[in-house]
């Protein structure tokens, strides 16, 4: 059955036609073509509307957060400093005194604190708190089984082969001991619970939501005054709407890594800064909770599973040099998130003191002293 459009009949030939009518006519004619044309049209419309909506949410979030002060900090892990041949205390002193860092993300590895079952050694974490407080810095303390740095989960050796019914209550007992020891410290600002919990990367065996909910409730009961941060998945668009709902969401942003599975080359994530602003904005709209950028890549990603100290400086520069660090920091600021913790402070100090390359350290110093 043919369609008849009077506006376009021979009677109207030579007469001026209104633009909306002409567009509608062209659209109808196009729509009458085969199914693949329709699929393409629908796909294009869907993509344009989706990206437009995402971008709009991102711009709203960035604008709504712009009035808040920017807090920049670093993650500091003594065990990692040791692995690079550094003195952890001296490294932390340099971070606080030379870079003038005022926000620290610290760890409380179960394997370090309860190396012997039932016996707690807080000495290493104690001196970190003391140094932070002497410098007037605030602390976000990572707690739980899964914490920053490989192998991601950090159980003591005596708990490795225990069934979950045994190690889980022991884990909670240790976590309560950590909270009780530090909850009255003036420098303690927040807890980060189970870093990147649902990421399967690393040597971990349990990802049950039930355990995460149970731990969250325990932490809030032990210290109701401090906000609890829980990580969302890094570059993925889905919103973490399942329980528990933390006080703040955390996100990690890595811009360049080594693809060991497919291309065996360095891989640059294509997402613009506003994409992460969209993730934070959508999170705020759906849950009412804000997002912090608690892990922004600031160190090289060695190829083929090598460690940093096995990798030449020239190779390290392929994934992180001074120019890229500055660009990454600017990228982090452009997301709109107002709390940013950089990843790699120990690495910057290693490059300066061991490899005699202060370029990254100098970039960080310029940023933290602005």
Residue ranges, per PLM feature:
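N-terminal Sec-pathway targeting helices
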Residues: 19-51
């Amino acid at each position: 059955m043919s369609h008849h459009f009077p506006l376009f009949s021979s009677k109207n030939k030579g007469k001026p036609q209104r633009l909306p009518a002409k567009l509608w006519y062209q659209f109808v004619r196009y729509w009458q073509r085969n199914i693949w044309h329709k699929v393409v049209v629908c796909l294009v419309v869907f993509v344009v509307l989706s990206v437009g909506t995402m971008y709009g949410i991102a711009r709203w979030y960035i604008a709504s957060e712009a009035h808040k002060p920017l807090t920049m900090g670093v993650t500091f892990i003594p065990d990692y400093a040791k692995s690079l041949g550094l003195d952890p205390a001296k490294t932390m002193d340099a971070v606080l005194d030379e870079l003038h860092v005022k926000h620290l993300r610290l760890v409380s590895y179960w394997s370090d604190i309860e190396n012997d079952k039932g016996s707690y050694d807080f000495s290493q974490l104690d001196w970190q708190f003391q140094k932070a407080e002497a410098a007037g810095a605030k602390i976000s303390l990572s707690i739980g089984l899964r914490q920053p740095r490989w192998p991601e989960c950090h159980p003591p050796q005596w708990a490795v082969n225990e069934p979950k019914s045994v190690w889980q209550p022991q884990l909670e007992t240790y976590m309560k001991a950590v909270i009780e020891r530090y909850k009255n410290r003036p420098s303690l600002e927040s807890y980060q619970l189970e870093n990147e919990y649902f990421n399967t990367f690393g040597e971990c065996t349990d990802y049950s939501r039930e355990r995460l909910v149970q731990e969250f409730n325990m932490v809030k009961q032990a210290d109701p005054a401090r906000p609890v941060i829980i990580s969302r998945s890094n570059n993925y668009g889905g919103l973490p709407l399942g329980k528990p709902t933390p006080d703040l969401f955390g996100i990690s942003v890595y811009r360049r890594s080594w693809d060991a599975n497919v291309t065996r080359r360095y891989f640059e994530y294509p997402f613009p800064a506003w994409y992460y602003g969209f993730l934070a904005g959508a999170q705020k709209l759906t849950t009412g909770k804000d997002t912090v950028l608690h892990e922004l890549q600031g160190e090289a990603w060695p190829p083929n599973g090598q460690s940093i100290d096995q990798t030449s400086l020239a190779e390290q520069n392929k994934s992180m040099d001074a120019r890229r660090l500055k660009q990454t920091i600017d990228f982090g600021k452009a997301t709109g998130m107002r709390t940013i913790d950089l990843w790699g402070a120990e690495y910057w100090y290693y490059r300066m003191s061991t490899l005699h390359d202060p370029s990254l350290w100098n970039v960080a110093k310029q940023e933290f002293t602005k």
